[in-house]
Amino acid sequence: MAGSGCAWGAEPPRFLEAFGRLWQVQSRLGSGSSASVYRVRCCGTPGSPPGALKQFLPPGTTGAAASAAEYGFRKERAALEQLQGHRNIVTLYGVFTIHFSPNVPSRCLLLELLDVSVSELLVYSSHQGCSMWMIQHCARDVLEALAFLHHEGYVHADLKPRNILWSAENECFKLIDFGLSFKEGNQDVKYIQTDGYRAPEAELQNCLAQAGLQSDTECTSAVDLWSLGIILLEMFSGMKLKHTVRSQEWKANSSAIIDHIFASKAVVNAAIPAYHLRDLIKSMLHDDPSRRIPAEMALCSPFFSIPFAPHIEDLVMLPTPVLRLLNVLDDDYLENEDEYEDVVEDVKEECQKYGPVVSLLVPKENPGRGQVFVEYANAGDSKAAQKLLTGRMFDGKFVVATFYPLSAYKRGYLYQTLL
């Protein structure tokens, strides 16, 4: 959906009008060579979720950079408009144009605002690696997105940890940034993918382009599987692998290096059955793109049949609409009905300070005995509550607040998390 144009000065204003509504620009989330992203909120609509405004052609951009920004905008808009509706691809709310001057239009995409990126998760889990639950969750979500966009004929062409973000509302990972995407068989971008996540055939193509030469073949959707394989290997190992994948040792025998990484982790945690993940990653990292497993087939891997449980760190890092409070109720409250009802009412009253509470559950038996599960109307309220309740004193005890998967909560599945 396209909106009307509006005028901006050299710096973004606090408020702008688009789609017949007033939007508050709250903060800058990030910027690149051709675009900046801002957090925005619709004014006059209480409870409406914030959005992400991606503004192409920042102030002062001219010449080739301006042309690149316009081109990137058109490519990303076209891809997102065709790929809308899939739960693992960022939602495009609308498109509009702003003007720094009458002759300098700046294109904008209004997108859903997502949460933590896989890049940030890798920083948190540096050297120890992500949990198998998180790796499995991310792998499945990204493969679902890739299977869909490949079926639609698209290649993402810039899959990397920074372009995979968590959605607190939908409780899944989503792909963003389709500025380098192209239709398979019609590659109109010379340089694709990011160093460290670039498939061998894309590396060759980029080198030829730098030398002014043209490759005989175009890249295919297989480049996305290569990138995902590297991402999953980094999540498992807790290490950045940019230099590893460029080494002669990797080129000579990447399979042996993958085996070594998995063998090293197996010594630390022998109870985790990781060989299915190892085999899945290997199937994505064949040098020959024709041998790489397609996304749809990868979803059938035995790795996805293993019921992993999240670590407590996962439930702190990945927001959801459900909050779990630990260290609130002891056995005395659970065994006395009057005291139990009083303390549950006190907890509910406290939690409602941060937003409407849809439901509240305090199991008297395991699993989940004595834990408090609070379902909020939206993840924004849950995040605010988690931030402010963590470390608070309740009945002389420090409260520990984590998130909890909404899907598991709805099914009544209160599993024991791993420490």
From Swiss-Prot:
InterPro entries in the record: Kinase-like_dom_sf (IPR011009), Nucleotide-bd_a/b_plait_sf (IPR012677), Prot_kinase_dom (IPR000719), RBD_domain_sf (IPR035979), RRM_dom (IPR000504), UHMK1 (IPR034372), UHMK1_RRM (IPR034371)
Reaction(s) catalysed by this chain's protein: L-seryl-[protein] + ATP = O-phospho-L-seryl-[protein] + ADP + H(+); L-threonyl-[protein] + ATP = O-phospho-L-threonyl-[protein] + ADP + H(+)
UniProt keyword list: ATP-binding, Cytoplasm, Kinase, Nucleotide-binding, Nucleus, RNA-binding, Serine/threonine-protein kinase, Transferase
MF GO annotations: ATP binding; enzyme binding; protein serine kinase activity; protein serine/threonine kinase activity; ribonucleoprotein complex binding; RNA binding; splicing factor binding
Role played: Upon serum stimulation, phosphorylates CDKN1B/p27Kip1, thus controlling CDKN1B subcellular location and cell cycle progression in G1 phase. May be involved in trafficking and/or processing of RNA.
Similarity section: Belongs to the protein kinase superfamily. Ser/Thr protein kinase family.
Organism (species): Rattus norvegicus
Protein name: Serine/threonine-protein kinase Kist
Family matches, as Pfam families: Pkinase (PF00069), RRM_1 (PF00076)
RRM domain span: 324-406
Active site: 141, 158
Gene Ontology annotations of biological process type: neuron projection development; peptidyl-serine phosphorylation; positive regulation of translational initiation; regulation of cell cycle; regulation of protein export from nucleus
Cross-referenced SUPFAM superfamilies: Protein kinase-like (PK-like), RNA-binding domain, RBD
EC number, as in UniProt: 2.7.11.1
